[in-house]
């Protein structure tokens, strides 16, 4: 969710850096696209299985041209099955078919065609649903909103509140959603379990290709598809596009599968999963999204109390998928216990990112994700210069060309970065091919606890600990050819138990390039020791954090180099792409900073941390004022 975005991770470092170097702080933009406070499922659910194309408990949806589309299919069992399903078609709308379901584990077969759900997109709201801001019987207290720090423009006509209680979602499902699957029929009790006929619903496209069935929101609603407390839901074999917030949104759900889905051309997210467990995302293709293609945020924190590097189990698995041509391929605040493997994250601005920044998200600080056996490469797309600076993203949403490849980044992120860990713990980045990322192959830095409204002094340094990056191939393609990263590993020297070892590199002697000013040590010896984060390294993020694509002044903040395209690395080794990392050498972390000395740097860190504690409270008050 925008509220859970990784990339304003800069906000955190920016605050600290600005204080340390005398910066003026941040101007807090307006909040937008809030969501209700969410909780984790109880973990008793399970991953559902596909019920096939012959489930007797089914509904069939078709369009007027479905017959012609089926006629053009090549002969074979799939064509015969589609012709048989066509004879049973009783619905022209997916939502209408969902509304007719009376028993769990019902399949909704969607025949080839384009579905805009005009009936529901244009349906007149009831008196109650049209006046939720003042008339809601189940209002959502502003204090419980999961808020936002950015203020993208709104392409939808949102005259009412956009953070609704679950009870109001049930009563007004089309206020924000084109298609809504709401499984909890008892919204007024404390349970979030799926307990009604929509449990186990399967939405299945019956075409040969994922693009044979297209669900086109046309920016009519905030979300194209919402599955809320819908345990056992299964999505398969279709394309969903043109949502302002999420194309496919799964919330507070225990047990789900998203398989062979294309999510494209959305202002923010392709696939967003939040506060969910027992989930599988596989064989998806996400592109042209202004935030991330795949977002597993606040995944069930089943390892939150686990102080071992190995997780007890994972809550969400992502495999055999592609995420490309987005601002980020993958992101997630509190993306806990997520296992992403055998995927391709390429041609985004940043490939993978996770963070512990935003308050209100269950499961903070982030922990125990694993990214292994992925291809993470060529994440150098500069959509800031291509579309934000040129004014394309200032046009009305429907005129920006999202279905022609326009991407309007909602968030600031460092162009040219493969993997970004902003304040995560116990994460494993291993056995990946990370290459041709012109800024950094991997990047890791600390997130002070006050930035998530945690003021217990003992937790100040509770992020950026016990992460391991090992057995990765840096700057080398799978075929063995060279495609250098700008810098293989960037780290702010903060945190305990972090280690980087057994990684190979395209650079001289096969040794990865780093900006490390302290030796983290081997994993077997416990990794890094405690050292306060180097202000010289983090301070450069201040200007970037003020990015706001809807504000002409801050569309490209002055002196922000994150939105500059790094030059393609050459065989001449460089530890300092674009000058963004402090020069590393015998003089240590203060090198390149006139008049800076290690003692001064340490003093600044101490002063800065005290000020951050105060700024956290100011930030919380400013967000409350904006929402009010």
Language-model features: locations:
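Right-handed parallel beta-helix/beta-spiral solenoid domain characteristic of secreted/periplasmic
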Residues: 57-58, 85-88, 117-123, 129-243
């Amino acid at each position: 969710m925008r509220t859970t975005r990784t990339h304003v991770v800069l906000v955190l470092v920016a605050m600290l850096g600005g204080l340390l170097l005398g910066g003026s702080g941040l101007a807090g933009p307006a909040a937008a696209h809030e969501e209700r406070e969410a909780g984790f499922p109880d973990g008793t659910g399970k991953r559902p299985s596909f019920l096939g194309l012959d489930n007797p408990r089914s509904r069939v949806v078709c369009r007027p041209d479905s017959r012609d589309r089926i006629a053009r299919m090549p002969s074979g069992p799939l064509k015969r099955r589609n012709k048989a399903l066509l004879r049973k078609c009783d619905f022209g709308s997916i939502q209408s078919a969902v509304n007719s379901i009376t028993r769990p584990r019902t399949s909704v077969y969607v025949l080839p065609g384009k579905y805009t759900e005009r009936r529901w997109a244009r349906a007149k709201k009831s008196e109650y649903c049209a006046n939720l801001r003042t008339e809601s019987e189940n209002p959502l207290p502003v204090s419980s909103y999961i808020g936002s720090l950015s203020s993208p423009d709104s392409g939808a006509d949102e005259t009412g509140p956009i953070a609704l209680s679950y009870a109001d979602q049930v009563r007004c499902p089309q206020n924000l959603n084109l298609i809504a699957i709401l499984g909890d029929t008892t919204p007024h009790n404390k349970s979030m379990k799926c307990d009604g006929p929509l449990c186990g619903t399967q939405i299945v496209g019956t075409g040969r290709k994922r693009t044979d069935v297209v669900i086109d929101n046309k920016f009519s609603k905030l979300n194209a598809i919402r599955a809320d407390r819908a345990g056992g839901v299964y999505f398969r074999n279709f394309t969903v596009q043109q949502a302002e917030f999420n194309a496919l949104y799964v919330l507070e759900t225990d047990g789900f599968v998203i398989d062979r889905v294309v999510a494209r051309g959305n202002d923010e997210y392709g696939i967003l999963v939040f506060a969910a467990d027992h989930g599988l995302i596989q064989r998806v293709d996400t592109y042209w999204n202004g935030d991330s293609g795949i977002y597993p945020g606040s995944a069930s924190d089943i390892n939150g109390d686990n102080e071992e590097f190995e997780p007890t189990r994972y809550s969400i698995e992502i495999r055999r998928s592609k995420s490309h041509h987005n601002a980020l391929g993958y992101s997630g605040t509190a993306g806990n216990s997520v296992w992403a493997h055998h995927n391709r994250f390429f041609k985004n601005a940043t490939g993978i990112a996770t963070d512990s920044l935003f308050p209100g998200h269950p499961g903070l600080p982030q922990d125990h994700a694993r990214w292994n056996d992925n291809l993470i490469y060529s994440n150098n797309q500069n959509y800031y210069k291509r579309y934000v600076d040129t004014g394309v993203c200032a046009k009305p949403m429907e005129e920006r060309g999202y279905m022609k490849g326009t991407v309007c980044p909602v968030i600031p992120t460092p162009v040219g970065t493969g993997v970004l860990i902003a304040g995560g713990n116990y994460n494993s980045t291993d056995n990946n091919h990370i290459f041709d990322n012109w800024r950094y192959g991997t990047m890791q830095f600390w997130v002070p606890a006050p930035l998530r409204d945690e003021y217990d002094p003992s937790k100040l340094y509770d992020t950026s600990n016990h992460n391991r990056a090992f057995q990765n191939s840096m700057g080398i393609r799978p075929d063995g050819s060279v495609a250098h990263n700008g810098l293989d590993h960037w780290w702010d020297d903060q945190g305990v138990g972090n280690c980087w070892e057994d990684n190979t590199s395209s650079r001289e002697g096969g040794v990865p390039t780093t900006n490390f000013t302290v030796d983290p040590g081997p994993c077997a010896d416990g990794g890094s020791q405690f050292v306060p984060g180097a202000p010289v390294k983090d301070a450069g993020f201040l200007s970037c954090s003020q990015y706001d694509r809807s504000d002409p002044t801050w569309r490209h903040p002055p002196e922000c180099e994150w939105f500059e395209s790094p030059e393609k690395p050459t065989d001449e080794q460089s530890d300092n792409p674009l000058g963004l990392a402090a020069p590393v050498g015998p003089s240590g972390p203060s090198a390149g900073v006139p008049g800076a000395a290690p003692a001064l740097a340490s003093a600044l860190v101490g002063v800065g941390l005290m000020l951050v504690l105060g700024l956290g409270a100011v930030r919380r008050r400013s967000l409350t004022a904006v929402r009010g």
